[in-house]
Amino acid sequence: MASLGVNIDHIANVRQARQTVEPDPVPMALLAELGGADGITVHLREDRRHIQDRDLELLRATVRSRLNLEMAATPEMVGIALKIQPDMVTLVPERRQEVTTEGGLDVAAQQGSLKGMVDQLQVAGIPVSLFVDPVSQQLEAACKSGARWVELHTGAYAEACWANQSFELARLNEATARARSLGLRVNAGHGLTYQNVEAVAAIEGIEELNIGHTIVARSIAVGLQEAVREMKRLVQNPRREPLFG
């Protein structure tokens, strides 16, 4: 049974749209936990477009589940992670003009530099996950980097038309099995919604799904606690086939 990590970046997006103090993502993280979140995920981007350094400091002091810090593989971010000591770091690619993370890390092309950062973080007691596309080459490179986890990028599945969704789901199944055969633990996320999450949640071997935008969007109608509860029910009791159409 997969657990649920709730990404609260989009709460900070609303705040930053007006450069004001609300909504504050810190108390919203508590509401997500009260709704059943097994962890809180935030992405501290280099341009600080949503989550701010102070948010991260306060979340570290208040989150009672698990704090997963998504960040670019840069010396600045490694230094912040070593100071904050999140429960996990997920290394992700960043491009300044992107609206959201557009793809997985090219671990195979950056293996040397990534290995140094992975080692530095894990020696400090912070488990590292690499956000990768569901491709064998990237999984093998992730294993060689020394990371203990991967997070499979589910964007291609989430964005596929119904005719291609089964193919993308099969890729995720195969990638999960391959990662586990390499000794990696597996999370997944990106673009998952109330309509498409169940088939991914049913994949044997995926330990946690990280989901944000759809939960925050749903919370406008029903409140954050209920939005998290609804998603948690789908993640914990999934149908075995994707809902097409």
Curated annotation (Swiss-Prot):
GO MF assignments: pyridoxine 5'-phosphate synthase activity
Group of enzyme by EC: transferase
GO cellular-component term (any): cytosol
Involved pathway(s): Cofactor biosynthesis; pyridoxine 5'-phosphate biosynthesis; pyridoxine 5'-phosphate from D-erythrose 4-phosphate: step 5/5
Keyword DNA-binding on entry: no
Family: Belongs to the PNP synthase family.
Protein name (record): Pyridoxine 5'-phosphate synthase
Species: Prochlorococcus marinus (strain MIT 9303)
